[in-house]
């Protein structure tokens, strides 16, 4: 061994530290370097002239304002990188690109308020990460994607806002083998000082929906009904001024709805479809000229009129509904004339024939078929009395009860949620109502101001139970059922364009997209698209 080597061994044995100076130009100003490590303090910018074999680098109180992409490409051998008491506030994407051997990354006691979602990309050997004591209010989703070797993460000392932006972090923590120190929330006020790991992700409501305008169908309409035929969704509109039932289908080339077939039907108020195997039926309820049944026996044929329905009973139909009784399809047509009567029409052979007359002389405006306690029921609304509930027994409908405190109800629609049956009752002026079935009676649950309402339509779209309250004088309101409260809460207004005298709403899923149809009496039918928005993104 040479003399210099022996001297170094003796000095080391005596406890004397001898700083190793790399070749000239390999230890920047304001840095202290040893053979495999460097400490830089007070440097005005990011030092770069290090030995390419450097293993450890500490940067303290530098003048760096941000870490840009590729900041450490010249020292790919780093195993440890430490930042403390620096003034930089932003870490950009790929700031640590090229550091595939880095195991320890400590970014502590700095002024970082923003870190890009791909800032840590490529750190495939990282085991220890600390972002403690910075100014981070949130972290971008997927920040830790690809960091499969992490064993320790320290996020303490940051003023996290515990809103939807941290939801992904709460969901991520249980899925990794790393120990994670998260610290406490700085806000909102209701969660201030609560430890992040005590938060329940299930309590966060971070999903929003929006209905945005998609398409206009020119003529006005009174009803809109979805149906599926030969595996393809369709819509049929009752267009009284155009004198037809218009069937729409999806144009896959133009990505829009287009007319497929129309059925001449003067003064039509409702077009009700029924699919039985290869056969398609459409009931066209008309104010004048008699209601008709149209049929298509098999695909490839056009719909053709096959039957005039109960001409002596259906004098002024106002609504038509489809229901199944003892395995057979039936239509119920609500008749609004004093001389006519609401009629139940059931299939018999090739046609549909009167099975029962209901509620004569009451000028019914609406019929709603529903199931209560496992049995078919029918609810009729009329201009002369409160809605009446009928139940199916002995092969016919018998009166069961009426709905208390429900005067001047124009129409009723029901929906199910959480095992309960709810009822939406439409009133033109005053308060429309939401009721819930208690096993023997519908009880009032909620009242909503009506301003010229002819429709209060519940719709289940994706995971959301919605209800739309139409208005002839203002914007129609979309409401959503909040499961925690069991009440409908305002979601949005429909428009622009504003709906002009809306009369019916329907939902259809087409090509993986969800659409809402709004049939309007004094304006064109409007189509809206349903969008889901992730607020935690």
From Swiss-Prot:
Q: Which GO terms describe its cellular component?
A: extracellular region; extracellular space
Q: Where is the protein situated, by its record's location annotation?
A: Secreted
Kindly give the Gene3D superfamilies that the UniProt entry links to this protein.
Answer: Ribonuclease Inhibitor
Q: Sites of glycosylation?
A: 177
| Tissues and organs where the protein is expressed, per its UniProt entry | Widely expressed, with highest expression in brain.
Highest taxon, organism lineage: Eukaryota
Q: Which InterPro entries match?
A: Cys-rich_flank_reg_C (IPR000483), EAR (IPR009039), EPTP (IPR005492), Leu-rich_rpt (IPR001611), Leu-rich_rpt_typical-subtyp (IPR003591), LGI_related (IPR051295), LRR_dom_sf (IPR032675)
Q: Where are the LRR repeats?
A: 53-74, 77-98, 101-122, 125-146
* Boundaries of every LRRCT domain copy: 158-208
Q: Which GO terms describe its biological process?
A: adult locomotory behavior; glial cell proliferation; myelination in peripheral nervous system; neuron maturation; regulation of myelination
Q: Extract the signal peptide range.
A: 1-19
Assigned keywords, A-Z: Disease variant, Glycoprotein, Leucine-rich repeat, Repeat, Secreted, Signal
Q: Name one Pfam family in it.
A: EPTP
- Which stretches are EAR repeats? 210-252, 256-298, 302-349, 351-394, 396-439, 441-483, 487-532
Keyword Cytoplasm in annotation: no
State the disease linkage annotated in the record: Arthrogryposis multiplex congenita 1, neurogenic, with myelin defect: A form of arthrogryposis multiplex congenita, a developmental condition characterized by multiple joint contractures resulting from reduced or absent fetal movements. AMC1 is an autosomal recessive severe form with onset in utero. Most affected individuals die in utero. Those who survive have generalized contractures and hypotonia. The disorder is caused by a neurogenic defect and poor or absent myelin formation around peripheral nerves rather than by a muscular defect.
Do you know which PANTHER family this protein is assigned to?
LEUCINE-RICH REPEAT LGI FAMILY MEMBER 4, LEUCINE-RICH REPEAT-CONTAINING PROTEIN
Q: Please describe the quaternary structure of this protein.
A: Can bind to ADAM11, ADAM22 and ADAM23.
- What does the protein in this record do? Component of Schwann cell signaling pathway(s) that controls axon segregation and myelin formation.
Q: What is this protein called?
A: Leucine-rich repeat LGI family member 4
Identify the coding gene. LGI4
């Amino acid at each position: 061994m040479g003399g210099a080597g022996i001297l170094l061994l003796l000095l080391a044995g005596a406890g004397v530290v001898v700083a190793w100076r790399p070749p000239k130009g390999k230890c920047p100003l304001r840095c202290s370097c040893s053979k495999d490590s460097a400490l830089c303090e007070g440097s005005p910018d990011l030092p770069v002239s290090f030995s390419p074999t450097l293993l450890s680098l500490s940067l303290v109180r530098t003048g760096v304002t941000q870490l840009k992409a590729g900041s450490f490409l010249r020292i790919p051998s780093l195993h440890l990188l430490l930042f403390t008491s620096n003034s930089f506030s932003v870490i950009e994407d790929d700031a640590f690109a090229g550091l595939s051997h880095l195991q320890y990354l400590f970014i502590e006691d700095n002024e970082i308020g923003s870190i890009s979602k791909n800032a840590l990309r490529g750190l495939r050997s990282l085991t220890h990460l600390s972002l403690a004591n910075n100014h981070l209010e949130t972290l971008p989703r997927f920040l830790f994607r690809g960091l499969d070797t992490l064993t320790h993460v320290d996020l303490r000392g940051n003023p996290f806002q515990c809103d939807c932006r941290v939801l992904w972090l709460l969901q991520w923590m249980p899925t990794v083998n790393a120990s994670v120190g998260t610290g406490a929330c700085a806000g909102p006020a209701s969660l201030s000082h609560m430890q992040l790991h005590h938060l329940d992700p299930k309590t966060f409501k971070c999903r929003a929906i929006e209905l945005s305008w998609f398409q206009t169908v020119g003529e006005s309409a009174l009803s809109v009904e979805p149906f599926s035929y030969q595996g393809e969704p369709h819509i049929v509109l009752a267009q009284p001024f155009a004198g037809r039932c218009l069937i729409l289908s999806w144009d896959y080339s133009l990505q829009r709805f287009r007319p497929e077939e129309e059925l001449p039907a003067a003064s039509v108020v409702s077009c009700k479809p029924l699919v039985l195997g290869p056969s398609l039926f459409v009931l066209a309820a008309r104010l004048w000229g008699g209601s008709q049944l149209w049929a298509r026996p098999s695909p490839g044929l056009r719909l053709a009129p096959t039957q005039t329905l109960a001409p002596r009973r259906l004098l002024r139909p106002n609504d038509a509904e489809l229901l199944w009784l003892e395995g057979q399809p039936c239509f119920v047509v609500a008749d609004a004339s004093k001389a006519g009567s609401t009629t139940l029409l059931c299939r018999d052979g090739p046609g549909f024939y009167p099975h029962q007359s209901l509620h004569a002389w009451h000028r019914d405006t609406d019929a709603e078929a529903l199931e209560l306690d496992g049995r078919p029921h029918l609810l009729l609304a009329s201009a002369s009395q409160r809605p009446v509930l009928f139940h199916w027994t002995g092969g016919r409908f018998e009166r069961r009860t009426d709905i208390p405190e429900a005067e001047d109800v124009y129409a009723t629609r029901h929906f199910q949620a959480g095992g309960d049956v709810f009822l939406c009752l439409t009133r033109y002026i005053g308060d429309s109502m939401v009721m819930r079935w208690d096993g023997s009676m519908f009880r009032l649950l909620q009242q909503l101001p009506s301003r010229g309402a002819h429709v209060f339509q519940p719709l289940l779209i994706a995971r959301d139970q919605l209800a739309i309250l139409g208005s002839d004088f203002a914007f129609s309101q979309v409401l959503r059922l909040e499961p925690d409260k069991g009440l409908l809460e305002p979601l949005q207004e429909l428009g622009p364009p504003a709906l002009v005298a809306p009369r019916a709403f329907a939902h259809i899923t087409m090509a993986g997209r969800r659409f809402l149809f709004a049939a309007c009496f004094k304006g064109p039918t409007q189509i809206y698209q349903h969008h889901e928005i992730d607020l935690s993104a």
